[in-house]
Protein backbone atom coordinates (compact mmCIF):
# COMPACT_ATOMS: atom_id res chain seq x y z
CA UNK A 1 0.00 0.00 0.00
CA UNK A 2 1.65 3.31 -1.03
CA UNK A 3 2.30 5.91 1.65
CA UNK A 4 2.47 9.08 -0.44
CA UNK A 5 4.31 12.38 0.12
CA UNK A 6 6.20 11.09 3.13
CA UNK A 7 7.99 13.77 5.16
CA UNK A 8 6.51 16.37 2.83
CA UNK A 9 5.95 19.76 4.48
CA UNK A 10 4.34 21.90 1.76
CA UNK A 11 0.52 21.93 1.47
CA UNK A 12 -0.56 19.61 -1.33
CA UNK A 13 -3.99 18.43 -2.44
CA UNK A 14 -3.61 14.91 -3.78
CA UNK A 15 -6.58 12.75 -4.70
CA UNK A 16 -5.75 9.09 -4.22
CA UNK A 17 -8.59 6.58 -4.09
CA UNK A 18 -7.54 4.31 -1.26
CA UNK A 19 -9.86 1.45 -0.39
CA UNK A 20 -11.22 1.01 3.11
CA UNK A 21 -8.82 -1.88 3.69
CA UNK A 22 -5.84 0.14 2.47
CA UNK A 23 -6.66 3.05 4.78
CA UNK A 24 -6.97 0.65 7.71
CA UNK A 25 -3.58 -0.83 6.80
CA UNK A 26 -1.94 2.62 6.71
CA UNK A 27 -3.52 3.58 10.03
CA UNK A 28 -2.18 0.41 11.58
CA UNK A 29 1.31 0.32 10.07
CA UNK A 30 2.47 3.57 8.42
CA UNK A 31 5.69 4.89 9.96
CA UNK A 32 5.08 8.46 8.75
CA UNK A 33 3.06 10.08 11.56
CA UNK A 34 1.14 12.55 9.40
CA UNK A 35 0.22 9.93 6.79
CA UNK A 36 -0.86 7.58 9.53
CA UNK A 37 -3.07 10.24 11.09
CA UNK A 38 -4.52 11.26 7.71
CA UNK A 39 -5.31 7.65 6.83
CA UNK A 40 -7.24 7.37 10.07
CA UNK A 41 -9.17 10.58 9.45
CA UNK A 42 -10.07 9.46 5.93
CA UNK A 43 -11.09 6.02 7.15
CA UNK A 44 -13.21 7.35 10.01
CA UNK A 45 -14.81 9.92 7.71
CA UNK A 46 -15.60 7.31 5.06
CA UNK A 47 -17.21 4.98 7.60
CA UNK A 48 -19.29 7.74 9.18
CA UNK A 49 -20.54 9.02 5.81
CA UNK A 50 -21.44 5.45 4.82
CA UNK A 51 -23.33 5.09 8.09
CA UNK A 52 -25.23 8.31 7.33
CA UNK A 53 -26.49 6.73 4.11
CA UNK A 54 -27.49 3.54 5.93
CA UNK A 55 -29.32 5.44 8.66
CA UNK A 56 -31.13 7.62 6.12
CA UNK A 57 -32.40 4.41 4.49
CA UNK A 58 -33.64 3.08 7.82
CA UNK A 59 -30.83 0.55 8.13
CA UNK A 60 -28.53 -0.18 11.05
CA UNK A 61 -24.92 0.82 10.28
CA UNK A 62 -22.35 -1.93 10.06
CA UNK A 63 -18.78 -1.30 11.15
CA UNK A 64 -15.87 -3.34 9.74
CA UNK A 65 -13.61 -5.28 12.07
CA UNK A 66 -10.63 -3.80 10.19
CA UNK A 67 -11.13 -0.35 11.76
CA UNK A 68 -11.17 -1.92 15.21
CA UNK A 69 -7.98 -3.87 14.50
CA UNK A 70 -6.23 -0.78 13.14
CA UNK A 71 -7.29 1.36 16.09
CA UNK A 72 -6.09 -1.34 18.48
CA UNK A 73 -2.71 -1.40 16.72
CA UNK A 74 -2.37 2.35 17.26
CA UNK A 75 -3.57 2.18 20.85
CA UNK A 76 -1.33 -0.59 22.13
CA UNK A 77 1.72 0.17 19.99
CA UNK A 78 4.82 1.90 21.25
CA UNK A 79 4.49 5.58 20.44
CA UNK A 80 4.03 9.13 21.61
CA UNK A 81 0.87 9.30 23.76
CA UNK A 82 -0.04 12.69 22.27
CA UNK A 83 0.12 11.22 18.75
CA UNK A 84 -1.95 8.20 19.74
CA UNK A 85 -4.62 10.51 21.14
CA UNK A 86 -4.57 12.61 17.97
CA UNK A 87 -4.73 9.56 15.71
CA UNK A 88 -7.76 8.11 17.50
CA UNK A 89 -9.76 11.34 17.72
CA UNK A 90 -12.67 11.16 15.30
CA UNK A 91 -13.20 14.06 12.89
CA UNK A 92 -15.73 16.56 14.19
CA UNK A 93 -19.24 16.91 12.81
CA UNK A 94 -18.48 20.27 11.18
CA UNK A 95 -15.49 18.74 9.34
CA UNK A 96 -17.59 15.77 8.23
CA UNK A 97 -20.38 18.06 7.03
CA UNK A 98 -17.92 19.78 4.70
CA UNK A 99 -17.46 16.44 2.94
CA UNK A 100 -21.19 15.94 2.29
CA UNK A 101 -23.43 17.45 -0.38
CA UNK A 102 -26.55 17.61 1.80
CA UNK A 103 -26.27 17.48 5.57
CA UNK A 104 -28.76 16.08 8.08
CA UNK A 105 -27.11 17.05 11.40
CA UNK A 106 -29.14 14.62 13.49
CA UNK A 107 -28.29 11.62 11.32
CA UNK A 108 -24.65 12.73 11.11
CA UNK A 109 -24.53 12.93 14.90
CA UNK A 110 -25.99 9.42 15.20
CA UNK A 111 -23.46 8.05 12.73
CA UNK A 112 -20.44 9.61 14.41
CA UNK A 113 -21.64 8.53 17.85
CA UNK A 114 -22.20 5.03 16.49
CA UNK A 115 -18.57 4.69 15.39
CA UNK A 116 -17.32 6.11 18.70
CA UNK A 117 -19.38 3.54 20.60
CA UNK A 118 -18.21 0.72 18.33
CA UNK A 119 -14.58 1.60 19.07
CA UNK A 120 -15.32 2.06 22.76
CA UNK A 121 -17.01 -1.33 23.01
CA UNK A 122 -14.38 -3.22 21.03
CA UNK A 123 -11.44 -1.57 22.80
CA UNK A 124 -12.93 -1.22 26.26
CA UNK A 125 -10.29 -3.39 27.91
CA UNK A 126 -7.43 -1.52 26.24
CA UNK A 127 -8.92 1.86 27.18
CA UNK A 128 -9.23 0.80 30.82
CA UNK A 129 -5.66 -0.50 30.95
CA UNK A 130 -4.23 2.65 29.39
CA UNK A 131 -6.32 4.89 31.62
CA UNK A 132 -4.85 3.14 34.65
CA UNK A 133 -1.32 3.00 33.20
CA UNK A 134 -1.24 6.75 32.56
CA UNK A 135 -2.39 7.78 36.01
CA UNK A 136 -0.45 10.84 37.27
CA UNK A 137 3.04 9.98 38.48
CA UNK A 138 3.05 12.83 40.98
CA UNK A 139 1.89 16.43 41.36
CA UNK A 140 0.94 18.29 38.18
CA UNK A 141 3.85 19.54 36.02
CA UNK A 142 3.33 21.59 32.84
CA UNK A 143 5.80 19.61 30.71
CA UNK A 144 5.25 18.22 27.22
CA UNK A 145 5.66 14.53 28.05
CA UNK A 146 3.11 14.65 30.84
CA UNK A 147 0.72 16.73 28.73
CA UNK A 148 0.72 13.89 26.18
CA UNK A 149 0.02 11.34 28.89
CA UNK A 150 -2.88 13.43 30.19
CA UNK A 151 -4.31 13.85 26.72
CA UNK A 152 -4.31 10.12 25.97
CA UNK A 153 -5.70 9.26 29.40
CA UNK A 154 -8.52 11.74 28.94
CA UNK A 155 -9.28 10.36 25.48
CA UNK A 156 -9.57 6.91 27.04
CA UNK A 157 -11.97 8.32 29.63
CA UNK A 158 -14.08 9.95 26.91
CA UNK A 159 -14.31 6.74 24.88
CA UNK A 160 -15.19 4.67 27.94
CA UNK A 161 -18.03 7.03 28.71
CA UNK A 162 -19.54 6.48 25.27
CA UNK A 163 -20.69 3.22 26.85
CA UNK A 164 -23.70 3.06 29.15
CA UNK A 165 -21.68 2.15 32.23
CA UNK A 166 -22.12 3.47 35.74
CA UNK A 167 -18.60 2.26 36.54
CA UNK A 168 -17.06 4.42 33.81
CA UNK A 169 -19.16 7.40 34.86
CA UNK A 170 -17.90 6.88 38.41
CA UNK A 171 -14.36 6.91 37.04
CA UNK A 172 -15.04 10.33 35.52
CA UNK A 173 -16.45 11.63 38.80
CA UNK A 174 -13.46 10.26 40.69
CA UNK A 175 -11.11 12.08 38.31
CA UNK A 176 -13.17 15.26 38.57
CA UNK A 177 -13.06 15.26 42.37
CA UNK A 178 -9.41 14.26 42.67
CA UNK A 179 -7.77 16.27 39.87
CA UNK A 180 -4.99 18.64 40.93
CA UNK A 181 -5.12 20.56 37.63
CA UNK A 182 -7.78 22.22 35.53
CA UNK A 183 -7.01 20.16 32.39
CA UNK A 184 -7.92 16.84 34.00
CA UNK A 185 -10.85 18.28 35.89
CA UNK A 186 -12.27 19.89 32.77
CA UNK A 187 -11.84 16.67 30.76
CA UNK A 188 -13.87 14.84 33.38
CA UNK A 189 -16.43 17.65 33.43
CA UNK A 190 -16.85 17.36 29.65
CA UNK A 191 -17.74 13.70 30.11
CA UNK A 192 -20.08 14.26 33.05
CA UNK A 193 -21.82 17.23 31.41
CA UNK A 194 -22.82 14.96 28.53
CA UNK A 195 -24.10 12.12 30.72
CA UNK A 196 -27.61 11.20 29.51
CA UNK A 197 -30.79 10.20 31.29
CA UNK A 198 -30.81 9.58 35.00
CA UNK A 199 -27.11 10.44 35.25
CA UNK A 200 -27.68 14.05 34.22
CA UNK A 201 -27.86 14.92 37.91
CA UNK A 202 -24.18 13.93 38.16
CA UNK A 203 -23.37 16.38 35.38
CA UNK A 204 -25.34 19.16 37.05
CA UNK A 205 -23.47 18.55 40.29
CA UNK A 206 -20.10 18.65 38.51
CA UNK A 207 -20.98 21.85 36.65
CA UNK A 208 -21.97 23.55 39.89
CA UNK A 209 -18.80 22.40 41.66
CA UNK A 210 -16.57 23.48 38.77
CA UNK A 211 -18.10 26.95 38.69
CA UNK A 212 -17.80 27.33 42.45
CA UNK A 213 -14.11 26.45 42.29
CA UNK A 214 -13.19 28.57 39.26
CA UNK A 215 -15.70 31.44 39.18
CA UNK A 216 -12.99 34.05 39.78
CA UNK A 217 -10.89 32.81 36.82
CA UNK A 218 -12.43 34.47 33.76
CA UNK A 219 -10.83 32.21 31.14
CA UNK A 220 -11.86 29.07 33.00
CA UNK A 221 -15.42 30.37 33.27
CA UNK A 222 -15.34 30.76 29.49
CA UNK A 223 -14.63 27.03 29.24
CA UNK A 224 -17.48 26.35 31.68
CA UNK A 225 -19.86 28.26 29.42
CA UNK A 226 -18.52 26.55 26.29
CA UNK A 227 -18.87 23.00 27.59
CA UNK A 228 -22.56 23.62 28.16
CA UNK A 229 -23.09 25.32 24.80
CA UNK A 230 -21.44 22.39 23.00
CA UNK A 231 -23.47 19.71 24.80
CA UNK A 232 -25.13 17.01 22.74
CA UNK A 233 -27.90 16.47 25.31
CA UNK A 234 -31.55 17.40 24.73
CA UNK A 235 -32.42 20.78 26.21
CA UNK A 236 -29.12 22.40 25.25
CA UNK A 237 -30.82 25.40 23.60
CA UNK A 238 -32.87 26.04 26.73
CA UNK A 239 -29.73 25.81 28.85
CA UNK A 240 -27.84 28.26 26.65
CA UNK A 241 -30.79 30.65 26.70
CA UNK A 242 -30.80 30.45 30.50
CA UNK A 243 -27.05 31.06 30.63
CA UNK A 244 -27.47 34.36 28.76
CA UNK A 245 -29.08 35.57 32.01
CA UNK A 246 -26.42 34.05 34.29
CA UNK A 247 -24.10 36.38 36.19
CA UNK A 248 -21.12 34.73 34.43
CA UNK A 249 -22.34 35.97 31.04
CA UNK A 250 -22.11 39.53 29.76
CA UNK A 251 -23.34 40.59 26.32
CA UNK A 252 -20.80 43.41 26.43
CA UNK A 253 -17.86 41.02 26.87
CA UNK A 254 -16.66 39.48 23.57
CA UNK A 255 -14.98 36.53 25.28
CA UNK A 256 -18.24 35.54 26.97
CA UNK A 257 -20.11 35.88 23.68
CA UNK A 258 -17.61 33.68 21.88
CA UNK A 259 -17.59 31.12 24.70
CA UNK A 260 -21.36 30.75 24.88
CA UNK A 261 -23.01 31.97 21.70
CA UNK A 262 -20.37 31.24 19.06
CA UNK A 263 -19.82 27.80 20.60
CA UNK A 264 -23.56 27.18 20.34
CA UNK A 265 -23.41 28.31 16.71
CA UNK A 266 -20.80 25.58 16.16
CA UNK A 267 -22.97 22.96 17.89
CA UNK A 268 -23.99 21.00 14.83
CA UNK A 269 -26.79 19.08 16.45
CA UNK A 270 -28.58 21.88 18.28
CA UNK A 271 -27.86 25.03 16.27
CA UNK A 272 -29.14 23.21 13.18
CA UNK A 273 -32.19 21.76 14.97
CA UNK A 274 -34.83 20.66 12.49
CA UNK A 275 -37.49 22.99 13.87
CA UNK A 276 -35.31 26.08 13.34
CA UNK A 277 -35.23 26.96 17.05
CA UNK A 278 -31.43 27.23 17.10
CA UNK A 279 -31.45 29.62 14.15
CA UNK A 280 -34.16 31.82 15.67
CA UNK A 281 -32.36 31.98 19.01
CA UNK A 282 -29.02 33.01 17.54
CA UNK A 283 -30.64 35.51 15.19
CA UNK A 284 -32.26 37.21 18.18
CA UNK A 285 -28.93 37.32 20.01
CA UNK A 286 -27.19 38.82 16.96
CA UNK A 287 -29.87 41.49 16.68
CA UNK A 288 -29.50 42.39 20.37
CA UNK A 289 -25.71 42.43 20.16
CA UNK A 290 -25.53 44.54 17.00
CA UNK A 291 -26.25 47.81 18.78
CA UNK A 292 -23.58 47.03 21.41
CA UNK A 293 -20.72 45.59 19.35
CA UNK A 294 -21.35 45.30 15.59
CA UNK A 295 -17.97 43.67 14.92
CA UNK A 296 -18.60 40.82 17.34
CA UNK A 297 -22.20 40.52 16.11
CA UNK A 298 -20.94 40.14 12.54
CA UNK A 299 -18.57 37.36 13.59
CA UNK A 300 -21.44 35.61 15.33
CA UNK A 301 -23.54 35.95 12.18
CA UNK A 302 -20.92 33.89 10.32
CA UNK A 303 -22.45 30.86 12.06
CA UNK A 304 -25.00 30.94 9.23
CA UNK A 305 -22.40 30.84 6.45
CA UNK A 306 -23.08 27.26 5.34
CA UNK A 307 -26.86 27.14 5.73
CA UNK A 308 -27.32 26.16 2.07
CA UNK A 309 -25.55 22.83 2.70
CA UNK A 310 -28.49 21.54 4.73
CA UNK A 311 -31.84 20.00 3.77
CA UNK A 312 -34.64 22.16 2.36
CA UNK A 313 -36.56 22.47 5.63
CA UNK A 314 -33.52 23.68 7.54
CA UNK A 315 -32.72 26.05 4.69
CA UNK A 316 -36.19 27.53 5.00
CA UNK A 317 -35.71 28.15 8.72
CA UNK A 318 -32.21 29.57 8.25
CA UNK A 319 -33.33 31.93 5.51
CA UNK A 320 -36.16 33.20 7.71
CA UNK A 321 -33.71 33.80 10.57
CA UNK A 322 -31.31 35.68 8.30
CA UNK A 323 -34.16 37.77 6.89
CA UNK A 324 -35.24 38.65 10.42
CA UNK A 325 -31.74 39.99 11.12
CA UNK A 326 -31.64 41.93 7.85
CA UNK A 327 -34.94 43.62 8.66
CA UNK A 328 -33.74 44.96 12.01
CA UNK A 329 -34.04 48.78 12.15
CA UNK A 330 -30.63 50.47 12.22
CA UNK A 331 -28.74 47.29 11.39
CA UNK A 332 -24.98 47.92 11.29
CA UNK A 333 -23.08 47.66 8.04
CA UNK A 334 -20.86 44.96 9.59
CA UNK A 335 -23.77 42.59 10.17
CA UNK A 336 -25.64 43.61 7.03
CA UNK A 337 -22.70 42.63 4.82
CA UNK A 338 -22.38 39.19 6.42
CA UNK A 339 -26.13 38.53 6.21
CA UNK A 340 -26.42 39.83 2.66
CA UNK A 341 -23.55 37.64 1.52
CA UNK A 342 -25.08 34.60 3.23
CA UNK A 343 -28.47 35.21 1.61
CA UNK A 344 -26.91 35.83 -1.78
For each predicted feature, which ranges?
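Long, ordered, helix-rich scaffold segments
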Residues: 1-344
Amino acid sequence: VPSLLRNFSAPVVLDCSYSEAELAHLLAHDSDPFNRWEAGQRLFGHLIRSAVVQLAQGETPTWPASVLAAARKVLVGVGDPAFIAEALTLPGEATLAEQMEVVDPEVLHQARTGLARYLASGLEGEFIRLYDAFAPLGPYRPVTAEAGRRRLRNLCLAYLNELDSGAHRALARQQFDGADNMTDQFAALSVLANAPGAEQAEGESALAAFYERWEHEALVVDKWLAVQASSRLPGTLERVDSLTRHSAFDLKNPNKIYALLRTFGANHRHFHAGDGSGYRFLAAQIAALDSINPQVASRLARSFDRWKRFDSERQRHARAALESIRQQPGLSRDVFEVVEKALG
